Amino acid sequence: YKNTINSTLRNLTLFHTMGNHDNEMEVGEDWAKSLKYTQNLAPDYYSFNIGKCHYIVLDNMDYEGIAAGHDNRSKYARNYTASQLAWLKKDLEHVDKSTPVFVTSHEPLSSPDGTGWDGELNGKDADLNEFISIFEGYDVRFLSGHTHNIYHRTYNQNFKEHNSGAVCASWWWSGYMTPGVHIAQDG
């Protein structure tokens, strides 16, 4: 991957977001599962500014409780850890409320059909509004993927989610990939 990026996309600046296939399943703890990723690509959560916009990258892939060596990448909680949420709140203290904020996590905040958030926040059942309230007063665009669908959701006037689907489109279940054309379901 790094060789391809360094040779093919070397003139682009890339910002990585950890997803459900980016963990090392042979080890035990969640932090250890993400160690190769954080040592080679990017921190699991971080922020940066480009122009007059603030970008926040969060990790909501929690593999806590998955035994070492058990490669079941579909068994995880959609969870923001307590330390990550504390960091997020501290980060936002340094961002003027008039600054546009873009937040990204691999998992979306709700499913394509609009049903609620089935994840956890700080290891407990989460209320989506509790997470969104952290960004009160900011104009936020939440960017997500994972679903293999493309959809947009407005949670309130200042918090909107754009789910981009997956770059692999539907080949993973259809077994069909049109050369040069990758299509994800819209809606």
Where are these regions (language model features)?
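Active-site glycine-centered loops adjacent to acidic/histidine catalytic or metal-binding residues
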Residues: G19-N20, H106, G145-H146
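Extended active-site neighborhood of metal-dependent phosphoesterases/phosphodiesterases
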Residues: Y1-K97, G119-R141, H152-D186
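Short acidic, glycine-rich surface-loop motifs adjacent to enzyme active sites
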Residues: L92-G114
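Flexible loop residues that form catalytic
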Residues: P108, T147, A166
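Short active-site segment of divalent metal-dependent hydrolases/proteases
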Residues: D22, L109, N149
